[in-house]
Amino acid sequence: MINKLGLNVATLTILSTGWVFANSTADLDDIKLYDIVKVEQCLDQAYDRVPGHARKLEFKIEGDDPFYEFDIESSKDGFIYNVECNAEEGYITEIEKEVDQNNSLFKSEAKITIDQARVKVLSIHPGKIMNEEREIGMDGSFTYEFDVQTNAGYEIKIDVDAKSGEIEEASFELYEIGMEKE
């Protein structure tokens, strides 16, 4: 009963945003209806926190809040940082450093494997994993992040806590400009 109630609440939350994600060809012109700050305002804030070069921009919805997420290649250490900015208020909400599978700090802190996280994500959102990352948050968190093109036709970004195995957040990606570094 609780699982059904949770599923129904989650479904109503998604539907109440007014977005239809089941069809990947849905008209995204409704983005203009959001009262959001200019992307440049958020990018300026991101550069203040992580000086470097923006390599990618995503616009996504978490719950009913719009966010810009920048991938910035740091001019200080060469790492890629994911910098998230609330698009309604224009402030930075999260900074994460991308690391590879050999990062000793990540390996020592992770209690679940990326394979276990992958299985959990695909059991909830069946589809094809388009990208996966290991991230260390500036708040001390350790996360596996997956971009999934679901069988239902929408793209979703899912963060799994590498210590607990719990899903931290899921967001619908509305657009992406730029590419992941290969």
List each language-model region with its residue ranges:
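Long, terminal "pre-/pro-" and other extracytoplasmic accessory regions
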Residues: 2-12, 16-182
